Amino acid sequence: MSYKITVHNREQNEKTHTYEADMCEMACLRKKRTGLPVNIYVDDSGVWKQSGHANRIKIQNNRGEHPVTTDMIPMSIGEAPDILIKNPKMELSQSDINAVKKFIIANKDLLNRLGEDMDIDDFIKAMVVIR
């Protein structure tokens, strides 16, 4: 899905710029709900099917409590989850990444059903929490 976004830098009083950007709405699953050391983002609308790539989650690249959607790390969903970008600037430990992989493996079928026959509320009720 493509949206037009208008950007205006008020500090420098620059002209307004309009550009198109691909935006995919993803639901934030906070770490207190999942048991993970980081917040993660899941596609609960099935937009990934229209985008030309496989389903994935995005990992917040810090351990903060507050959701941060900049500098996210995409990870595949499957039996052997993998980071989908080369050499990311990583602020997370290998232990953090391993916990996310464990969550994906435990919930891969549910993650793939999101946006098809399962909504985010049903997912949250059924998901395996990592402790």
Annotated model-derived regions:
Residues 1, 23-26, 72-75, 90, ...:
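Detector for methionine-enriched segments
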Residues 1-57:
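Short, charged/polar N-terminal "headpieces" of proteins
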Residues 23, 29, 36, 84, ...:
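Generic detector of leucine side chains in alpha-helical contexts
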Residues 36-98:
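A short, structured beta-strand/loop element
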Residues 89-131:
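Short, compact, well-ordered microdomains
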